[in-house]
Amino acid sequence: MGIMMMILGLLVIIVCLCTALLRWNQMRYSKKGLPPGTMGWPIFGETTEFLKQGPDFMKNQRLRYGSFFKSHILGCPTIVSMDAELNRYILMNESKGLVAGYPQSMLDILGTCNIAAVHGPSHRLMRGSLLSLISPTMMKDHLLPKIDDFMRNYLCGWDDLETVDIQEKTKHMAFLSSLLQIAETLKKPEVEEYRTEFFKLVVGTLSVPIDIPGTNYRSGVQARNNIDRLLTELMQERKESGETFTDMLGYLMKKEDNRYLLTDKEIRDQVVTILYSGYETVSTTSMMALKYLHDHPKALEELRREHLAIRERKRPDEPLTLDDIKSMKFTRAVIFETSRLATIVNGVLRKTTHDLELNGYLIPKGWRIYVYTREINYDTSLYEDPMIFNPWRWMEKSLESKSYFLLFGGGVRLCPGKELGISEVSSFLHYFVTKYRWEENGEDKLMVFPRVSAPKGYHLKCSPY
């Protein structure tokens, strides 16, 4: 009996302590002028609930507090915005104190000069440098021929395989395609070394920044250091060779006729940015497009008709051109609808540089603002039957210009590689649907939060078309 009373007393103390901690944390952030919301536990906030419940957490908070509320997620006090017009304002007004505010682990691993970390003149320099690498002329003369050659060869022989894990294949595809555009002279062992380190880096960017052995963060930092070493060695070799290279690294290192001269560190950060920024969006969009096309035969029929018409105009070995990519209207619609329905990117983070008024509330300096776009993608007032895969909705070009179109970010942070990414996915779909028919091999489950993935892979059986 005595032991039971002790246990009961201990439980009461724990409950009281937890309640007190929750109340204390809520009072810490109950400043006058803040939007409504809850802050969860000290230090951890509501991150656990956010990651565990995902979209349901956001839906519940929206029902309780509206489309603009406070929380404590991703390691810091955060304002969540789900209002389409307000989101556009936030993204369009970096100069008013709404700068990029990505998690510390991402900034540490991607580098202090990466395009997501800098703003003002530094951002203009890095963005200008990146845009010069993927201009229409560069796309036409250099990038697209390399992408086409890579996709044509990468997709060969899949019908000889018992099963194809599309998730694994598209991840490797996105990474290898980018790496070969950056440094086309790399040998296979060098490519494998980059690949091994890069996949560790990706995991590290989405980890808690605890720098102790065994953590994903430590592994990510070490992977970034190893990639820096590999890049430094490659850049030194190129400097000593005196040769001219026409890949992205060659243009970044070019001293003559280069408006955007970067330091060696800025070049390394730019290379990692190029590898990282397109990796998940290109790979996941490619995988999910095949999933939706499999489930919607009419959409697949329309897409295949578009690509077969292009092939009929060409010799068997003739590559895709930029004009071909531009002519793929339905393919572009499939890519947009896949990005919307799967919500490849859940939102965008901003940070306040000073106390500022927003939506009638006073947001303190240093708080993050999470422009949460997932709910907007499924808003019935914006999209008819939003839970249905309907690429035809995007054939109306004006939909891309709507204020709530944030699939690629917005404002000065609009994804600079948008058209390059679309070209890569379009090329992948072109060669896949003209080479193969496919069926799902098993009942693989897909997760949609915190990132779209197939925990055990997404397996297909391919046969010749």
Swiss-Prot record:
Annotated EC: 1.14.14.180, 1.14.14.-, 1.14.14.179
Keyword Kinase: no
Database matches in CDD domains: CYP90-like
One GO CC annotation: membrane
Keywords per UniProt: Brassinosteroid biosynthesis, Endoplasmic reticulum, Heme, Iron, Lipid biosynthesis, Lipid metabolism, Lipoprotein, Membrane, Metal-binding, Monooxygenase, Oxidoreductase, Prenylation, Steroid biosynthesis, Transmembrane, Transmembrane helix
Motif (Farnesylation CAAX motif): 462-465
Task of the protein: Mediates Baeyer-Villiger oxidation and catalyzes the C6-oxidation step and lactonization in brassinosteroids biosynthesis. Converts 6-deoxocastasterone (6-deoxoCS) to castasterone (CS), and castasterone to brassinolide (BL). May also convert 6-deoxoteasterone (6-deoxoTE) to teasterone (TE), 3-dehydro-6-deoxoteasterone (6-deoxo3DT, 6-deoxo-3-DHT) to 3-dehydroteasterone (3DT, 3-DHT), and 6-deoxotyphasterol (6-deoxoTY) to typhasterol (TY). Also seems to be able to convert teasterone (TE) and typhasterol (TY) to 7-oxateasterone (7-OXTE) and 7-oxatyphasterol (7-OXTY), respectively.
Protein name: Cytochrome P450 85A2
Species name: Arabidopsis thaliana
Gene name for this UniProt entry: CYP85A2
